[in-house]
Curated annotation (Swiss-Prot):
GO biological process entries: tRNA thio-modification
Entry similarity comment: Belongs to the TtcA family.
Subcellular localization, as worded in the UniProt entry: Cytoplasm
InterPro entries assigned to the protein according to its UniProt record, in alphabetical order: Rossmann-like_a/b/a_fold (IPR014729), TilS/TtcA_N (IPR011063), tRNA_Cyd_32_2_STrfase (IPR012089), tRNA_thiolation_TtcA_Ctu1 (IPR035107)
Name of protein: tRNA-cytidine(32) 2-sulfurtransferase
Region Disordered: start-end pairs: 1-26
Positions contributing to [4Fe-4S] cluster binding: 132, 135, 223
Single GO cellular component term: cytoplasm
NCBIfam families: PRK10696.1 (NF007972)
Residue interval(s) of motif PP-loop motif: 57-62
Length: 298
């Protein structure tokens, strides 16, 4: 059962919003606003009249996303609407009061979706196994349904540069494909445009910004599930690279925007068969060993 609590004009609560910026935080904030604004411009993430659903989990990434979008909204070249949306999955111990109080104090329109996906995942996934994959699918479905029902034209997620690079290596190492996490995508059913405005922002900058702003962070370990061993290994690898070779993560991120099909091996992206003097090539089957007749012995 799904319940939606919609509070477009939140009442005043005895809670505080983000901390007022100091000099150092203001410099970081300017850099992050510039990076987010650049990503929005580069990929056409937000257009005039868009109604943007900002998915807020209570983690540092989504808090930072909402905070920066609210700041950019005041000076954006086009008008757009922002609504914070949280999916309450009924995890045991989830502090349901935190987000409503924070958003009410901030004066931000918000909606809370109440859907008990935790019980579903707990029933289906054996104890000790990671719940993240199924939980993610159920969460995505709930958010897509909500976006459709309430007329949202954009769904904004808090994935950042490090997430995109990690996904690239997850696909490379474990799925034998060069694919990552796009800054903007159309959902499989063609009904939703998903945007990731933090695509150019590094995770360590988000962590510093969130700490300086004193966001009321909600732990992501309430469900007792942990990230997969594979993703944890990739994360440790990237963290080590970042320490040993500063700038490497940014270089990898830039490489994802400079793909050269002619220097890879995907024949669906580049016509290798057309290269040569005549532009003609025998069919692949003709080169298979079992397709070439043996020459009879004399």
């Amino acid at each position: 059962m799904t319940a939606v609590i919609s509070l477009p004009d939140p009442p005043q609560r005895a809670s505080r919003g983000p901390r007022v910026a100091g000099p150092g935080q203001d410099r970081l904030g300017k850099r992050l606003r510039r990076q987010v604004g650049q990503a929005i411009a580069d990929f056409g993430m937000i257009e005039a009249g868009d109604k943007v659903m900002v998915c807020l989990s209570g983690g540092k990434d989504s808090y930072t996303l909402l905070d920066l979008l609210l700041q950019l909204q005041k000076r954006a070249p086009v008008p757009f609407e922002l609504v914070a949306v949280n999916l309450d999955q009924k995890q045991p111990g989830f502090p349901e009061h935190v987000l409503p109080e924070y958003l009410a104090a901030l004066g931000v329109p918000y909606q809370i979706i109440e859907q008990d996906t935790y019980s579903v995942v707990s029933r289906v996934i054996p104890e000790g196994r990671t719940m993240c994959s199924l939980c993610s699918r159920l969460r995505r479905g709930a958010l897509y349904n909500h976006a459709k029902a309430h007329g949202f034209t954009r769904i904004a997620l808090g994935h950042h540069c490090d997430d995109m690079v990690a996904t690239l290596f997850m696909n490379l190492f474990h799925h034998a494909k060069l694919a990552a996490m796009p800054p903007k995508l159309l959902s499989d059913d063609g009904q939703h445009v998903v945007i990731r405005p933090l695509a150019y922002v590094r995770e360590h900058d988000i962590a510093e910004y969130a700490q300086a702003r004193r966001f009321p962070i909600i732990p992501c370990t309430l469900c007792g599930s942990q990230e997969s061993l594979q993703r944890r290994q990739v994360g440790l690898m990237l963290k080590q690279w970042d320490q040993d070779h500063p700038g490497r993560i940014e270089q990898i991120a830039r490489a994802m925007a400079d793909v050269r099909p002619a220097q890879l091996a995907d024949a669906t992206l580049f016509d290798f068969r057309a290269l040569g003097h005549s532009g003609h090539a025998a069919h692949a089957d003709a080169w298979l060993a079992d397709a070439v007749p043996e020459t009879p012995a004399d």
